[in-house]
């Protein structure tokens, strides 16, 4: 079965359709609709529909996006795409697309991919960092993604740090 992956970022959505061997059949990039949630849903739905019309065969849909998916509610939280926060994106897309949608944090997707078949495949512990419109991280140990009870394990981009003290930390 073909697989459609969407990498949702603060400024762009990149879509790639892969065949059974992992070869890219089509790649497309569009601006991220980030002003209204309804526009975001329409943009993603239109993109997936374009692929359906062109390839005329079923494919799975997987989405990596900034922010966490609450294990309790399934709603997006902590996203730098503010219109997504509090929304049940998976349910909304599944209803519009009439098919299952896999949804995960983008940094978690990156870290797991590198740990399984990328630069970290020989390592026991892999930390993946994303630097873009926002920043985030994912941690994989023994090929297993760590997400934690709040689905934010590995996230480092929005942590409060203590202030710099020259007498304690030295001069730079």
What is the predicted role of each segment?
Residues 14, 68, 109, 155-158:
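Residue-level recognition of specific faces of alpha-helices
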